[in-house]
Each structure stands twice: as structure tokens, then as C-alpha cells.
Amino acid sequence: MRKRAFIFGSAWLVAASLPLVLMAVGQPQEHAVTLRIMPVGDSITRGTYLGGETLPNPLGGGWRKRLQDRLRAAGVPFEFVGELDYWAYGADGVVDPSFSPRHHGLAGFSNEGILKGGVVPTPKAVLAAKGVQEVRVPGIVEALARNKPDVVLLMSGANGFDASARDRLVETICAHFDGELVVATITPQKAPRRGWELVVPYNASLPGLVERHQKEGRRIRLVDMYAALTPDDITKDGVHPNAAGLDKIADAWFRALVPEKPRPRVGAIR
């Protein structure tokens, strides 16, 4: 894995072993290095096809499209990476040429599934467009090695709520990845989603897991995505975010990637 040790403690993203990775937001970027971001998760990461199997769909890129819009507006050079490449579509049905389509959002997969890989449930229109019978992805270790991300955005567990498998997934990523891991609690769920009441206890153990890895020197941080959304931000299926929810997810990831500059205290010497 490449040594591009990005640090997200201020408005700067710095890489050891490179002269300059990314100038502060809004500054010239003549020597900026493109940040390789790998979104890892389930159908919420992939982007739900709310129109069933009919493509194109305006929400095809989910929160990934929205996050990319924010990063681009902030002047952050980036590339999304992952084993899948479902595109985002504009309202007029034309592929958005600025969209970076790759991701590792494995629809229907549990934490264990993401860890091990397998056949990904894929809309028929996507299979037809690709001319394949199925889409298969490797386990997370091989996926990391193949895609070489600088940052992993992990939000998983909505399928199965298996905290022990999540812990193994996080441990595996930390053991095979020297970049920055940003892990999120899962978003709220509601009826008629089966098991929606398990979301809170599943999320409750995540801060402790992150803290333990931080104390061990791992480069891992937490985003509280559950607190960022409300049940009103979830569609009638009880699990997938609606347009407002997707915006909030993108905002939360953006704040994690591009922290605000510290504001001077009133009366402080400038």
C-alpha cells in the first residue's frame, strides 16, 4: 500500500513523502494530489434505485454524487475508487460526465459479506448494459489492495446488525490499510423494516471500538451518521434514505473530510 498519510485534523490534508498534497480549501492547488476515496457499505452506499430496475434514475449515485458535488465546490481534487462502477444520472437522463462512479457499496451485504466478498445483487438493466450474467467482488483485503485508497468511508451493518462481524471488518481494514478509515454509525430505520429497533444497540458499541483502535495507534475516526438523520429522512421501506437523507449523509462525510477552519475567539489577537 502506498504511503500517502493524509491527516484530517485541520483544513489541510498533508501527505508524508510528498512535497504537497492538498492546499487549504479555496487556495491554489498547482501541486495538489488527487485524494482516492473508497466508499464501503451496502445499498445505501451504492445508491438505491428508487425506480426499481428502470435506469436512468436521478438518485442512482445516492450520497456519493452529492458528496462529490461538495468536494468539487470546495476545490478538493478527488477520485472515488472501488470494485463497482454504477453511474449517477441527471434528471434529464444523461450520464453526468463529472461523476466519479466507482465505489464498494454491496447491496444486501452484511458485514460478513463485505469482509468475504461474493456475488452482488445487481439491477437487470446494469447487467444488460455490462453484458454480464453476474457481478462478483473480492473480499475487503483484496479490494483494498486493488483499489489503493487514501481514505475509506465505511458505513455498514444495516443488513443483519452483526456488531461482532463489524468489529472483525474494522480490524481487518486496519490491519491491511495504512490510510485513514472513517467509520460511521448506521442511519435510522423504522417500520416496516424488520429489526429496525436493533439499530440503536448496534450503533452503541461503535464509539468504544473506534476509541480502542485509536489508542492502538490506528488512523480511524467516527462519524455519527445516526444523529445526522431522523426517521423522516428515511423512505417508506424503512431503511433507505430519501433525497433529504442523502444530502445529510453527504454533509456529514464532507465535514469529516474537510473540517472547518478554526474560528478565532471573540477578543482574541489575530
Locate predicted features.
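Substrate-gating cap/lid alpha-helix
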Residues: G179, P188-V223, A243-D247
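Active-site cleft segment of glycoside hydrolase catalytic domains centered on the general acid/base Glu
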Residues: F161-T172, P192-Y202, T235-P241
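N-terminal secretory targeting modules
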Residues: M1-D85, V137, A145, Q214-R219, ...
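Solvent-exposed, polar/charged alpha-helical surfaces in well-ordered, non-transmembrane soluble domains
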Residues: K65, D69, P138, E142, ...
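Histidine-centered active-site loop/cap adjacent to the catalytic His
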Residues: I37-V40, I234-R270
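Conserved SGNH/GDSL esterase-like catalytic core that processes O-acyl groups on lipids
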Residues: M38, I44-D167
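A cross-domain feature marking catalytic cores of carbohydrate-active enzymes
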Residues: S156, T185-I186, D224
